[in-house]
Amino acid sequence: MFTGFSDATIDFLWELRFHNERPWFLEHKQVFLDTLDRPMKALAADVTAALEQAYPDRKWYLHVARIYRDARRLHGNGPYKENLWFTLRCDSSRGPEIPAFYFEITPHNYSYGMGFYWAKANTMACFRRAIDADPLPLTALAERLNAQDTFVLTGQDYARAKGDPGALLHPWYNKRVLDLSCVREHDDLLFSPALTDALVRGFGFLLPYYDYLEAVTRREDA
């Protein structure tokens, strides 16, 4: 059961940033396991179990990131990631091109939300076509998002706007990649078991957005 991260979690992430090498990591591996790896896996398991109970008609697929970077893609970085995350999807048959729910912790902050890790150009073109064909479903979702203060629309914009469906949907329409995120500084919630409930509530709020985006990717594959 998740009981919260700790100051030691943040200390480890900062120290790893400045000592990102195998000898240091091996010397501090038990600290990693105790303060980051096991709490992350416990949080992910608790959130997944709660979502399965709350939404029994859905199948949830969990992935917890490993601390080890792909040795083929270091590009001058150290062998270990300086952040850690987990993702949840309702479809295991496709990869990171479909949206996912996520939680991530870094030395600076933590975040959770839902969106694309990356999105193909065809996916976003299909997204724009869906808006053009019927803007009302996304209009309702955009208004719902604007009526709360936990999640915000983020993600890289196209350098040149793809179109203008009106002030409300313009920020959505012109995203190269789309994310609904909540970013917080390290606070009491991070160090509390109440984080589990916060994620479950947040992911529940984001489910209609996930369904909308996931349906877009299915239309693209059709």
Positions of PLM-derived features:
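Aromatic- and glycine-enriched beta-alpha-beta binding-site module
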Residues: 72-132
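A short, surface-exposed loop/turn module that caps and links secondary-structure elements
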Residues: 53-80, 84, 149-162
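Long, solvent-exposed, polar/charged low-complexity segments
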Residues: 1-15, 44, 151-222
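Inter-helical turn/loop segments and adjacent helix faces that build the functional surface
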Residues: 20-27, 121, 125, 192
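Active-site acidic/histidine clusters and adjacent loop/turn architecture
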Residues: 14-67
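Compact, glycine/acidic-enriched structural inserts
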Residues: 106-164
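Long, hydrophobic, amphipathic alpha-helical segments used as structural scaffolds
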Residues: 47, 51, 55, 142, ...
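Short histidine-centered catalytic/ligand-binding loop motif
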Residues: 29-36, 116, 126-131, 191, ...
